[in-house]
Amino acid sequence: MTENRGRIGAGEDTAAVVAALHELIAGQAVADWQAVITAVQELDHVGAGPVGYWGMSMGCGLGVPLLAAEPRIRAAVLGLLGVHGLAEAAARVTVPVRFLLQWDDDLVPRDQGLALFDALASAEKTLHANPGKHGEIPGFEMDSSLRFLARHLG
Protein backbone atom coordinates (compact mmCIF):
# COMPACT_ATOMS: atom_id res chain seq x y z
CA MET A 1 0.00 0.00 0.00
CA THR A 2 2.84 2.40 0.79
CA GLU A 3 4.28 1.77 -2.67
CA ASN A 4 0.92 2.59 -4.27
CA ARG A 5 0.59 5.80 -2.27
CA GLY A 6 4.09 6.75 -3.39
CA ARG A 7 3.18 6.11 -7.03
CA ILE A 8 0.07 8.26 -6.72
CA GLY A 9 2.04 10.95 -4.85
CA ALA A 10 4.55 10.97 -7.71
CA GLY A 11 1.74 11.84 -10.11
CA GLU A 12 0.90 8.43 -11.54
CA ASP A 13 -2.73 8.04 -12.60
CA THR A 14 -4.73 6.93 -9.54
CA ALA A 15 -7.12 4.83 -11.64
CA ALA A 16 -4.21 2.93 -13.20
CA VAL A 17 -2.64 2.22 -9.79
CA VAL A 18 -5.96 1.01 -8.35
CA ALA A 19 -6.67 -1.12 -11.45
CA ALA A 20 -3.25 -2.78 -11.18
CA LEU A 21 -3.89 -3.56 -7.51
CA HIS A 22 -7.32 -5.03 -8.27
CA GLU A 23 -5.88 -7.13 -11.10
CA LEU A 24 -3.18 -8.50 -8.81
CA ILE A 25 -5.63 -9.39 -6.05
CA ALA A 26 -8.41 -10.64 -8.37
CA GLY A 27 -6.09 -13.23 -9.88
CA GLN A 28 -6.23 -15.15 -6.59
CA ALA A 29 -9.53 -13.84 -5.24
CA VAL A 30 -11.64 -15.32 -8.06
CA ALA A 31 -10.34 -18.83 -7.34
CA ASP A 32 -10.76 -18.27 -3.58
CA TRP A 33 -14.37 -17.06 -3.98
CA GLN A 34 -15.19 -20.01 -6.24
CA ALA A 35 -13.81 -22.39 -3.60
CA VAL A 36 -15.89 -20.66 -0.91
CA ILE A 37 -19.07 -20.92 -3.00
CA THR A 38 -18.42 -24.63 -3.57
CA ALA A 39 -17.75 -25.27 0.12
CA VAL A 40 -20.83 -23.37 1.28
CA GLN A 41 -23.11 -25.03 -1.27
CA GLU A 42 -21.91 -28.44 -0.08
CA LEU A 43 -23.31 -27.75 3.39
CA ASP A 44 -26.54 -29.68 4.01
CA HIS A 45 -28.40 -26.63 5.32
CA VAL A 46 -27.41 -24.47 2.33
CA GLY A 47 -27.45 -26.51 -0.87
CA ALA A 48 -26.82 -25.45 -4.43
CA GLY A 49 -29.30 -22.57 -4.70
CA PRO A 50 -28.62 -19.30 -6.48
CA VAL A 51 -25.84 -17.01 -5.25
CA GLY A 52 -25.74 -13.23 -5.17
CA TYR A 53 -22.80 -10.84 -4.96
CA TRP A 54 -22.57 -7.41 -3.31
CA GLY A 55 -19.38 -5.40 -3.75
CA MET A 56 -18.55 -1.72 -3.61
CA SER A 57 -15.23 -0.04 -4.41
CA MET A 58 -12.56 -2.76 -4.13
CA GLY A 59 -15.38 -5.29 -3.78
CA CYS A 60 -16.56 -4.17 -7.20
CA GLY A 61 -13.04 -4.45 -8.61
CA LEU A 62 -12.85 -8.05 -7.41
CA GLY A 63 -16.49 -8.81 -8.16
CA VAL A 64 -16.53 -7.94 -11.86
CA PRO A 65 -13.89 -10.60 -12.74
CA LEU A 66 -15.67 -13.07 -10.43
CA LEU A 67 -19.03 -12.46 -12.10
CA ALA A 68 -17.42 -12.89 -15.51
CA ALA A 69 -16.04 -16.29 -14.47
CA GLU A 70 -18.66 -17.74 -12.10
CA PRO A 71 -22.01 -18.96 -13.49
CA ARG A 72 -23.48 -19.78 -10.06
CA ILE A 73 -23.83 -16.07 -9.26
CA ARG A 74 -27.26 -14.99 -10.49
CA ALA A 75 -27.42 -11.29 -9.52
CA ALA A 76 -25.09 -8.59 -8.24
CA VAL A 77 -24.97 -5.19 -6.63
CA LEU A 78 -21.84 -3.30 -7.69
CA GLY A 79 -20.52 0.23 -7.67
CA LEU A 80 -18.15 2.93 -6.47
CA LEU A 81 -15.53 2.04 -9.06
CA GLY A 82 -14.53 3.02 -12.57
CA VAL A 83 -13.97 1.04 -15.74
CA HIS A 84 -10.17 1.23 -15.79
CA GLY A 85 -8.87 -2.35 -16.13
CA LEU A 86 -12.34 -3.93 -15.99
CA ALA A 87 -13.88 -3.38 -19.44
CA GLU A 88 -13.05 -6.84 -20.78
CA ALA A 89 -14.44 -8.68 -17.74
CA ALA A 90 -17.47 -6.34 -17.56
CA ALA A 91 -18.34 -7.26 -21.15
CA ARG A 92 -18.80 -10.86 -19.93
CA VAL A 93 -21.12 -9.97 -17.03
CA THR A 94 -24.67 -10.88 -18.07
CA VAL A 95 -26.51 -11.33 -14.75
CA PRO A 96 -28.89 -8.65 -13.44
CA VAL A 97 -26.87 -5.81 -11.87
CA ARG A 98 -27.80 -2.90 -9.65
CA PHE A 99 -25.01 -0.31 -9.90
CA LEU A 100 -24.50 2.39 -7.25
CA LEU A 101 -22.69 5.62 -8.08
CA GLN A 102 -21.96 8.53 -5.77
CA TRP A 103 -22.35 11.70 -7.83
CA ASP A 104 -19.74 13.63 -5.83
CA ASP A 105 -17.30 10.70 -5.46
CA ASP A 106 -13.90 12.09 -4.51
CA LEU A 107 -12.02 8.90 -5.47
CA VAL A 108 -13.72 7.66 -8.63
CA PRO A 109 -14.38 10.12 -11.47
CA ARG A 110 -18.06 10.11 -12.42
CA ASP A 111 -17.35 9.41 -16.09
CA GLN A 112 -15.32 6.33 -15.13
CA GLY A 113 -18.15 4.95 -12.97
CA LEU A 114 -20.64 5.58 -15.76
CA ALA A 115 -18.28 3.88 -18.23
CA LEU A 116 -18.13 0.76 -16.03
CA PHE A 117 -21.92 0.67 -15.84
CA ASP A 118 -22.08 1.00 -19.61
CA ALA A 119 -19.47 -1.76 -20.11
CA LEU A 120 -21.56 -4.32 -18.20
CA ALA A 121 -23.22 -6.63 -20.75
CA SER A 122 -26.23 -7.28 -18.53
CA ALA A 123 -29.56 -6.92 -20.29
CA GLU A 124 -31.08 -6.07 -16.90
CA LYS A 125 -29.06 -3.39 -15.16
CA THR A 126 -30.02 -0.26 -13.27
CA LEU A 127 -27.95 2.76 -12.32
CA HIS A 128 -28.60 4.38 -8.95
CA ALA A 129 -26.85 7.73 -8.54
CA ASN A 130 -26.94 9.64 -5.27
CA PRO A 131 -25.32 12.83 -4.05
CA GLY A 132 -22.37 12.28 -1.77
CA LYS A 133 -18.75 11.28 -1.63
CA HIS A 134 -17.17 7.85 -2.00
CA GLY A 135 -18.71 5.48 0.52
CA GLU A 136 -21.57 7.79 1.54
CA ILE A 137 -24.24 5.44 0.21
CA PRO A 138 -27.66 6.35 1.62
CA GLY A 139 -29.26 3.77 3.90
CA PHE A 140 -32.27 3.38 1.62
CA GLU A 141 -29.95 2.14 -1.15
CA MET A 142 -28.72 -0.62 1.14
CA ASP A 143 -32.30 -1.70 1.90
CA SER A 144 -33.27 -1.51 -1.76
CA SER A 145 -30.18 -3.50 -2.78
CA LEU A 146 -31.16 -6.29 -0.40
CA ARG A 147 -34.64 -6.38 -1.95
CA PHE A 148 -33.05 -6.51 -5.43
CA LEU A 149 -30.95 -9.53 -4.46
CA ALA A 150 -33.89 -11.25 -2.72
CA ARG A 151 -36.07 -10.75 -5.80
CA HIS A 152 -33.48 -12.26 -8.14
CA LEU A 153 -32.39 -15.07 -5.84
CA GLY A 154 -35.73 -15.95 -4.26
Each model region followed by its residue ranges:
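Short alpha-helix in the alpha/beta-hydrolase fold that links the catalytic acid
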Residues: 95, 109-118
